[in-house]
Amino acid sequence: MTYVYAFDHPHEKPPMSLKDLLGGKGANLAEMTSVLQLPVPHGFTITTDACRAYMGGRPGGGPNEPGGWPAGLTEEVAARLVELETSMGKRLGDPADPLLVSVRSGAKFSMPGMMDTVLNLGLNDESVLGLAKQTGDERFAYDSYRRFVSMYGRIVLGLPAEPFDAHFDKARERSGAENDATIPADALADLVEDYKALVEHHTGMTFPQDPADQLRGAIEAVFRSWGGARAVAYRVKERISHDLGTAVNVQAMVFGNRDDNSGTGVGFTRDPATGAAGAYGDFLVNAQGEDVVAGIRNTLKLAEMQRLFPSIYDELLAIFDRLERHYRDMCDTEFTIDQGKLWMLQTRVGKRTGGAALRMAVDMTTDERMRLTHAEAVQRVTAEHLEQVLHPQVGGGDVQVIATGLAASPGAGVGKAYFTADAAAEAAGRGEAVILVRSETSPEDVHGMIVAKGILTSRGGLVSHAAVVARGWGTPAVVGADGVHIRGASFEAGGVTVKEGDVISVDGSTGRVMLGAVEVTVSEPPPEFDTILGWADEIRAGKLAVRANADTGADAANARRFGAEGIGLCRTEHMFLADDRLPIVRRMILADTAEDETAALEELRVAQKADFYEVLEAMDGLPVTVRLLDPPLHEFLPRTEDLLVRASMPAGLSEEERRLLRAAEAWHEFNPMLGIRGVRLGVLKPGLYAMQVRALMEAAADRVAAGGRPVVEIMIPLTIGREELALARGWVEEAVARVSAGVDMTIGTMIETPRAALRAGEIAEEADFFSFGTNDLTQMTFGFSRDDIESRLMPAYLEQGLLKRNPFDTIDAAGVGELVMLAAERGRAAKPGLKLGVCGEHGGDPESITLFHAAGLNYVSCSPFRVPIARLAAAHAVLSGRAPGS
């Protein structure tokens, strides 16, 4: 097995197709070098195979138990290093003219800022003198060395950043320098000694001087960073597999910190926030790449390069054009100017906001250089992009703006200010809405950024760590708000002091920071939103419909506005919980005689009829699936514990409360999820289901009389066998016969127990349709109680790799998904025309929708606000090429 490839290695396939092996950064560096022949510093890539071997190569090894340095890797790295030295005419560690390299991570999927980078590797106490002599610039040499010692100490040796930062600040103050670029050489040389002393104090060892030891240490650090807490947290959030590993890229250094004819920057071929055509980005003069994203200095706009470096700016724009033509997408780049020479250090398809993704996708269908098809444009937009454009925005009304910064990630965020990632995470764990406030963020802050409703930094630009991560996650963010002066757990801005726990608001669309909680409104999607969804609907038409879960006329009308093609789940129990209905339900439960029960049911029938009428009216002409009562009756009664507490008080219980207590005790269940609910409740109280069916059919008849076209589907919950469904079907048909409605009506059942899935062939004989209730099917298949395991057990299972996905968010393909496939196959074998749908929360999850399409389902159903996401995901599923039933 080959572990190391030079950037210019002649691969049999296009390098950009080898991201599994080379990682995204390595594949694109090879593509730019060997295919596009852009100015890229020479280097080589250590593959993801090597990382996986290192992380889990020993027997029993795993992500938290390193397998060790792979056999043969040392020799391969040495061979590629000799080639690199030959091509550059320099040798690593040469005291007279040293080659310096960067060591960077590069996983298959972009994980900006989550893993580690080491720059200027190869410097030591001797080679720094050679670098100073060769360049004639002692300041540059020691600036590079102090950066290397600091990075190596933090990333490879695991030292905290704060002591390095403190020494740096002291050096700058002592020298009277305005910023890092003006600290003189002698102060930087002293700073190197301070840094080395820090390393020895914390580790008990002197700073490594052998470049070979430095290189191996840096490679291992990048491997280890794949299993680091921030990278794991990012992958859990982004649903990236822990098994992929990261590649490592070793590349000859070019220097943006050499002089004022040098610089470094991050550039996008289009605006990643709005999608507007034209170059976009930030850069710094006399700086190294990490300075731009770290927010150490506020950056210059890319357009400023036209004034400072006009010929290089033109060259960069020409490269941007070539990259867009080649990748047929917006690209994110990193570049360095080394004494007037432009070098490209990285490119990748750039992360973007939801609005930008929509605009780019539509624009690129008419861009002569790209000519995307409608299908390609639809595939460029993700579910997360749609969610972002539906993000809340700052509404009307007076607001108190206390500072402004750069609008880094759109949307409105409201919450309590917290000044460390740990404090933010703790507050979010208590259920508080949090705004994370930092001078600048770093990868160590990820656990606080994940839970934040908004992010505010006082330093940094639009390509800083905070901006890039927030845009990728759709978290509102304002960065570079230099009017915000942070002092410990408070900040001052606009004459106001904001302390930890005070409520502030950030507007990532305008850059405003506001005191207090602002009014938040639902945003208006851009016109491209409807364009993309229209194309998505054309792609999935006749293959996979999208319905909504809605319980009221207002919900149904809202769902229809979002493009729902019917109601896949109308939960009748929600109609019972209204303040004016609950007393009637309790009278029905407490009834001592059949007459009393019938009287209560009659009152409920009248109320439910009105509810059903509103839903049928909103969905006129489209199918409405009504699930008969599902939860156990004790959910409509007061809690036994509350009644017992009141009974112990001097006033005691009223007569009605005593009756409620007896009923609550009678209907109490130790495991309600597996108790008397669904069709089992109908067996004990058949009059309840008969009442609901009559109310529904009478509402449908009234709709017909009013000129409507109701399409009714009656669904029996929680059946486990044919006999049970046959009994329930009899109740329904008897009730329907009492109402001459002239209405299209079918009767089906939910498949939500493993037994029902296994016996689907028999159940299909009594059903016109199946709807998979994947919430309960997941609970019963795993033996998980969702309410009990999601807050404590699930995070541990995900972080330790025991589960790759939360099965309540994305369907478990190997278990629950297989039951869905099996039930669909057996049901259709018994009844070829059987309609199949899903109404659990998985119906709005893109990955789950792909499985449902493959299983041959006719529709998915989800909450109204996820209907647009499901429409897009259904089109993606159709375009994936996985045929139904495969």
Regions found by a protein language model. Give the residues of each.
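Extended, non-globular alpha-helical segments
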Residues: 404-444, 493-531
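Short secondary-structure boundary segments
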Residues: 44, 481-482, 517, 774, ...
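Hydrophobic alpha-helical bundles that form the membrane domains of multi-pass transporters
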Residues: 476-477
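Nucleotide/phosphate-binding sheet-loop regions of phosphoryl- and nucleotidyl-transfer enzymes
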Residues: 1-397, 426, 432-435, 442-447, ...
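Flexible inter-domain linker/hinge segments
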Residues: 226, 389-415, 531-548, 555-558
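Conserved alpha/beta-domain cores
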Residues: 104-105, 525-531, 535-885
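Structural motif
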Residues: 249, 418, 435-439, 456, 458, 480, 549, ...
